[in-house]
């Protein structure tokens, strides 16, 4: 049985006879559009393509395809302007028709003439008609003959700047310099009063010459806020002309249409009729043939002015087809073949419109960066569809590489329906349905535009986009799935990059959430039933003062659980993620409903969340708060430091605390690392202003009972007295190193209870020495109202004492209000969690009684051990602990808690790594380069230590390099300009809130890095922890809930071989049943590649390429003195030119590019030196 080709089926409906081979002299979506109609007409189709377009879709849609010239013979654009080469291809392959599409040679009369002379049928108006209307100046003369109104302009083309200036002098500003040939917004420049006419003229002519091969321009009066209305025309070879009604093309940017509507929604009937009549009149006057478009402007008084006739098919012809049902391309081809309009059934009185249609051009442009065209590889492409949705696309599919050589349009989306509003909503739906990943698109902008009240009313004008900055307040596509895949792919290739991780988690599955049981043994449904009321309800109903009073009146000792903060800080390097806290949160809300509080925020957890876990600490707080509404949340606040490591302006602390209170923190444990009361008061006052519970805290240090100790009972009672005078709700005692022995606990708490019988006392310790259970038992028996504990599996060593051990110690003496069975059920979860985070465990085997000598805080002990191992000092751990003790005394025997503990630790490691004794340090102090933290301490930036700074050691260390502060550091700091910070963050990172401002104030660089990480990988907190910390195994499937009701099913399919040229591997995933491919650089491989330096777009001395393209002209050289706004280079990209200007005054230090060089987006072009240019005389 013989095999028939699909193409042979066309012979059954051949309409054009033997002449049926058509070549489209164009690229992208328009050849595809034409090929489809040609195939319907049983024609054979031929595509042409440049070397750069050899993978383009239009080449594949044709029956035959031929490259234009040899490799390197033409530029990417120049290939499609090579008239003789294109005609030669047509002749060689027996082409009968040539369709020019739009752009390129579509309005070139020379091309039309040569096509006809070559014996090929030209689909379009003849050359003489193109000359009479395609040239905008000739078209004005035509309008005068037809008595159709036009906008005042030069009578003919101009060749010099002086002619442009003469027109400006006669008619005034504003004017527009326009290319006499072509369209699409290229070769156009609006010049307003004060603008540089000469520069605009030069750019317009240069751009026109590049785009259309002809730089001729003319000047005309520029109308403010007009509508742009165009009429679709069809004319045959027998003098018949019809119009297919109008399109409203007023929504434009850079004179290039963005959204088109047919018919015009708000055009009065009499104006529409006059425009349609004039359009037909113009076509008949010039003897027009084939398809064309008459374009008009309509001013605010509904006066219309003829602009030009475009002698070609338009990009937006699709929406006219949708409302009339007429295939314009089919009409073009058949008219060129000799058919008359009547033969095609096209009578004016029979042509009607039905409903409305809207077209949106989806481009790879970034609206947030002034519509900068984006380049790169499309990773994901999923298009819209359904009733009333038409797509006309070109190179739009997964894997497409978007180059800088051609127009940035991916696809035209046209929607049609019975009313304007129905179509608008349909278009919104269609745009939302698109999924395009890997390159930026203008879809977020289009959605904002379609929902703007002006667009809804249909009253837009040609500069509507430029005049409406609200359009740029866009809701961006989140691209969550693709970003997560990039992270998982990176981990699959390179492993985890989380600092501090050693090896992989020991737990190979997700921890199981335990079931709680009520008194009757029934399982409690913690997700459906509200948790029991707790102490937070008392706080919310009665306020901080009454809350504190009721805590004091409680008949027993309350417990605060530190598992969510200090416990994992002390044992697991603060690495426990929001995902795992949120998983157990509903269960915790039921199990620990009677708990005084959960310590869950602040301190090191704040910056570690951003710095290492790539999470937003505010999102963690809000999420946990929503899941645990009944138990108070407590945070750690470092007085005048907030959660930073040094003092900040007072207004930054006030601002931060307010955000913390508003987002869920109830109790603020406020401390100062030196017990500096002036520093402490800043935090206390901030909490009072915010309406939180103040737990002003005394930091405990050393062995209080040892004779001669600096920090004795009298010292603590004196500090406590001053804290009480500040008006604290609760008095906190913070034993950071766990050096409070049971006897000291009994004495101190007993003394405080006797002195302050009505004040709640809250004690915190660490179990580093193994005595914490005994110490906290002593505190409780001595009258402490609250003591800190941790879940059993997260207790002991450098963490807090075990809750069950403490309950056993207090049993029969003091009530805690805790359900022991519920605690055991919770503990099962945390036992598994400990295994999940085993890769962050410190190598501590048991208690360290030496803590009474070195006094290293519990949270720091594990971190210091890790740092020592990272610095190669792990084998010298005993020496490090000894050095820590010596460093403490060098600094004056200070209270050690973040950030002062870091100062001691840095100095200790400095001593060990440089093999220095304390005597060496004292002797060489005036010549050693100490760590910055030590310098900050001695300058006084952390505060004033009890007993003062040690002299002359302080002076030797500072060596007049730094001042000696004697007052509170915050008094020396200027208040932050919060409004300016907010505005700067908004400009850099988009949608920000007050919490972002607070994060930036605390940790500017960390916040910036976090935002960059989130932009790259999205919200990583949704990933299961095993997948976050370790590579997926092949065929392993995980579920990722990105929001309620949206779950991603991700399976790793394979990791590809190394591409030795690029150093990349391809990682294949199955995402919700759809294959995704991610390219990842293998960082274990060294690949020699030539890369250009990238500009820091926030550095005014860096001038970078705003988009990928070709440098047309470099206007400066090394040593040039330039001013802000002065052009430094001209870039050609996406068939348009733009001037790159200097963002600041300066002198050119280096130029990194030359004329004709290709550049990528953000490539560093020019580097400036910070020097004000010298004024020169003319």
UniProtKB/Swiss-Prot annotation:
GO terms classed as biological process: gluconeogenesis; pyruvate metabolic process
Catalytic reaction list: hydrogencarbonate + pyruvate + ATP = oxaloacetate + ADP + phosphate + H(+)
Binding-site list for a divalent metal cation: 566, 734, 764, 766
Residues the record lists as N6-biotinyllysine modifications: 1135
Class of this enzyme: ligase
Known function: Pyruvate carboxylase catalyzes a 2-step reaction, involving the ATP-dependent carboxylation of the covalently attached biotin in the first step and the transfer of the carboxyl group to pyruvate in the second.
The keyword Ion transport belongs to this UniProt entry's keyword annotation: no
UniProt-listed SMART domains: Biotin_carb_C (SM00878)
Keywords associated with the record: ATP-binding, Biotin, Cytoplasm, Gluconeogenesis, Ligase, Metal-binding, Multifunctional enzyme, Nucleotide-binding, Zinc
Residues annotated as domain Pyruvate carboxyltransferase: 557-824
Domain ATP-grasp: 140-337
Active-site feature positions: 312
Annotated ATP binding sites: 136, 220, 255
Pfam (any one): PYC_OADA
Protein name as catalogued: Pyruvate carboxylase 1
Domain Biotin carboxylation stretches: 18-470
Domain of life: Eukaryota
Additional detail: Present with 12500 molecules/cell in log phase SD medium.
Cofactor(s) needed by this chain: biotin; Zn(2+)
Keyword Lipid biosynthesis: no
E.C. number(s) listed in UniProt: 6.4.1.1
SUPFAM superfamilies: Aldolase (SSF51569), Glutathione synthetase ATP-binding domain-like (SSF56059), post-HMGL domain-like (SSF89000), PreATP-grasp domain (SSF52440), Rudiment single hybrid motif (SSF51246), Single hybrid motif (SSF51230)
């Amino acid at each position: 049985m013989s095999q028939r080709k699909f193409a042979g089926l066309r012979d059954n409906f051949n309409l054009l006879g033997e002449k049926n081979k058509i070549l489209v002299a164009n690229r992208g979506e328009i050849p595809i559009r034409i090929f489809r109609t040609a195939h319907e007409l049983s024609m054979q189709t031929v595509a042409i393509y440049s070397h750069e377009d050899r993978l383009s879709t239009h080449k594949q849609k044709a029956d035959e395809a031929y490259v234009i010239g040899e490799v390197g013979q033409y530029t990417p654009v120049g290939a499609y302007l090579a008239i003789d080469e294109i005609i030669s291809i047509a002749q060689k392959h027996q082409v009968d028709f040539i369709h020019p599409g739009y752009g390129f040679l579509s309005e070139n009369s020379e091309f039309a003439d040569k096509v006809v002379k070559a014996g090929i049928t030209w689909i379009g108006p003849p050359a003489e008609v193109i000359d009479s209307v395609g040239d905008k100046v000739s078209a004005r003369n035509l309008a005068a003959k037809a008595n159709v109104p036009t906008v005042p302009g030069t009578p003919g083309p101009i060749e010099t700047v002086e002619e442009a200036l003469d027109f400006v002098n006669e008619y005034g500003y504003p004017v527009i310099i326009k290319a006499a040939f072509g369209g699409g917004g290229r070769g156009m420049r609006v010049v307003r009063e004060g603008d540089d006419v000469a520069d605009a003229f030069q750019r317009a002519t240069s751009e026109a010459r590049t785009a259309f091969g002809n730089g001729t321009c003319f000047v005309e009066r520029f109308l403010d806020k007009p509508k742009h209305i165009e009429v679709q025309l069809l004319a045959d070879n027998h003098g018949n002309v019809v119009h297919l009604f109008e399109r409203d093309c007023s929504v434009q940017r850079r004179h290039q249409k963005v959204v088109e509507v047919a018919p015009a929604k708000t055009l009065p009937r009499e104006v529409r009729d006059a425009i349609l009549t004039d359009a037909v009149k113009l076509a008949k006057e010039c003897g027009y043939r084939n398809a064309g478009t008459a374009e008009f402007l309509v001013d605010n008084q509904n006066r219309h002015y003829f602009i030009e006739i475009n002698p070609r098919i338009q990009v937006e012809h699709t929406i006219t087809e949708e409302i009339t049902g007429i295939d314009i391309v089919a009409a073009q081809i058949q008219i060129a073949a000799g058919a008359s309009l009547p033969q095609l059934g096209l009578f004016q009185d029979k042509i009607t419109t039905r409903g409305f249609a809207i077209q949106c051009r989806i481009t790879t442009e970034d609206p947030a960066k002034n519509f900068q065209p984006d380049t790169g590889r499309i990773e994901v492409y999923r298009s819209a569809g359904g009733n009333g949705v038409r797509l006309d696309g070109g190179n739009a599919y997964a894997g497409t590489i978007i180059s800088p050589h051609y127009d940035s349009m991916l696809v035209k989306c046209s929607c049609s329906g019975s009313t304007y509003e129905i179509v608008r909503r349909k278009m919104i739906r269609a745009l939302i349905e698109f999924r395009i990943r890997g390159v930026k698109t203008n879809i977020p902008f289009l959605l904002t535009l379609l929902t703007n009240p002006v667009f809804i009313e249909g009253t837009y004008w040609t500069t509507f986009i430029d005049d409406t900055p609200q359009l740029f307040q866009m809701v961006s596509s989140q691209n969550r799935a693709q970003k997560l895949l990039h992270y998982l792919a990176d981990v699959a290739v390179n492993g985890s990059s989380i600092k501090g991780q050693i090896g992989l988690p020991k737990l190979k599955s997700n921890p199981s959430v335990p079931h709680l049981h009520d008194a009757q043994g029934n399982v409690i449904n913690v997700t459906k039933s509200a948790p029991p009321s707790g102490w937070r309800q008392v706080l919310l109903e009665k306020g901080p003062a009454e809350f504190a009073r009721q805590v004091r009146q409680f008949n027993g000792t309350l417990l605060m659980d530190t598992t969510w903060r200090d416990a994992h800080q002390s044992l697991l390097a603060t690495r426990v993620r929001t995902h795992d806290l949120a998983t157990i949160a509903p269960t915790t809300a039921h199990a620990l409903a009677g708990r005084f509080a959960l310590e869950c925020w602040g301190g090191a957890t704040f910056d570690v969340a951003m710095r290492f876990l790539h999470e937003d600490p505010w999102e963690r707080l809000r999420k946990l708060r929503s899941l645990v509404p009944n138990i108070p949340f407590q945070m750690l606040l470092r007085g005048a430091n907030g959660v930073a490591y040094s003092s900040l302006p007072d207004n930054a602390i006030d601002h931060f605390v307010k955000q913390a209170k508003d987002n869920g923190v109830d109790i603020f444990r406020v401390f100062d690392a030196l017990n500096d009361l002036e520093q402490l008061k800043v935090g206390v006052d901030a909490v009072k202003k915010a309406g939180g519970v103040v737990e002003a805290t005394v930091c405990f240090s050393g062995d209080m009972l040892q004779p001669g100790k600096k920090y004795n009972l009298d010292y603590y009672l004196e500090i406590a007295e001053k804290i009480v005078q500040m008006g604290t709700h609760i008095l906190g005692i913070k034993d950071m190193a766990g050096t409070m022995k049971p006897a000291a606990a009994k004495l101190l708490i007993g003394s405080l209870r006797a002195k302050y019988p009505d004040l709640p006392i809250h004690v915190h310790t660490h179990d580093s020495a193994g005595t914490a259970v005994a110490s906290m038992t002593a505190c409780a028996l001595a009258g402490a109202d609250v003591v800190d504990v941790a879940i059993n599996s997260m207790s002991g060593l450098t963490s807090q004492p075990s809750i069950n051990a403490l309950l056993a110690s207090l049993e029969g003496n003091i009530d805690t209000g805790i359900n022991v069975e519920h605690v055991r059920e919770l503990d099962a979860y945390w036992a598994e969690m400990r295994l999940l985070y085993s890769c962050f465990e410190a190598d501590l085997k048991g208690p360290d009684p030496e803590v009474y000598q070195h006094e290293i805080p519990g949270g720091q002990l594990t971190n210091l051990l890790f740092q020592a191992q990272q610095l190669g000092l792990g084998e010298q751990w005993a020496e490090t602990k000894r050095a820590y003790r010596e460093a403490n005394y060098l600094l004056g025997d200070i209270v050690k808690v973040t950030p002062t503990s870091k100062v001691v630790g840095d100095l200790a490691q400095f001593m060990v790594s440089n093999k220095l004794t304390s005597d060496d340090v004292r002797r060489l102090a005036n010549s050693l380069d100490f760590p910055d933290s030590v310098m900050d301490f001695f300058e006084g930036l952390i505060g004033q230590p009890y007993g003062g700074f040690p002299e002359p050691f302080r002076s030797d260390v500072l060596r007049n390099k730094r001042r000696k502060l004697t007052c509170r550091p915050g008094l020396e700091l200027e208040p932050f300009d919060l409004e300016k910070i907010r505005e700067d963050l908004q400009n850099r990172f988009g949608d920000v809130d007050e919490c972002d401002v607070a994060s930036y104030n605390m940790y500017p660089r960390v916040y910036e890095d976090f935002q960059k990480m989130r932009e790259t990988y999205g919200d990583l907190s949704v990933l299961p922890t095993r997948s976050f910390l370790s590579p997926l195994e092949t065929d392993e499937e995980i579920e990722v809930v990105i929001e309620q009701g949206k779950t991603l099913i991700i399976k790793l399919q394979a990791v590809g071989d190394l591409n030795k040229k690029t150093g990349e591997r391809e990682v294949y995933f199955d995402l919700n049943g759809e294959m995704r491919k991610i390219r990842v650089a293998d960082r274990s491989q060294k690949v020699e590649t030539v890369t250009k330096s990238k500009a820091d777009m926030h550095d005014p001395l860096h001038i970078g390429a705003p988009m990928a393209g070709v440098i047309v002209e470099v206007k400066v050289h090394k040593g040039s003195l330039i001013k802000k706004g002065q052009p430094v280079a001209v870039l050609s990209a996406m068939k348009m030119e733009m001037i790159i200007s200097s963002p600041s005054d300066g002198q050119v230090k280096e130029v990194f590019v030359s004329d004709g060089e290709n550049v990528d987006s953000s490539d560093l072009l020019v580097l400036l030196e910070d020097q004000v240019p010298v004024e020169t005389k003319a």
